[in-house]
Amino acid sequence: MKTIYTIIICFLLANVTNAQERYLTKNGAVTFFSSAVVEDIKADNNQVLSIIDAGSGKMAIKILMKSFMFKKALMQEHFNENYVESDKFPKATFKGTIVDFESIKITNLETKVEVKGVITIHGINKEIVIPANIIRTEESILVKGEFNLFVADYNIKIPSVVAKNIAKKIKVTFDFNHKPYKK
């Protein structure tokens, strides 16, 4: 009987420890920017879900494509219906690991890191290494940075009629302020 209680207590403590090691944000920010000959295109999404396991440095991100907001409604419509096909591919995801996360000290200092993993956009999976800056404190894990994506890598077709309006290389910036996850 004592063995059963010991197992149950160990299981419960393990779950409590794991819960304390996860950091989450539901309002992370991702922006993409396309600089082209005819016009610049910028879209913001402030409803990005991101979680970090502080024990392992594993990170997962989920972005709802329809949550990107554009300056012009027509740009948003074309983005969702014609390019990323949001009804067919409603989200973009990233699953990876912050390299050498365990060596990042809990301070208020910004540390340069690399995040390695797989990004999925438009149903296409690509391995990627993203440079980022991280600030790790007792209360939060802030991860921010920028990188470039190529539209062609994700099988996103741009009609030749508007090819001059959209850059082939898209600049992506992100800013996630993770707080301890509490169930």
Per-region residue spans from a language model:
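Low-complexity, acidic/polar, glycine-enriched regions of mature
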Residues: Q20-K183
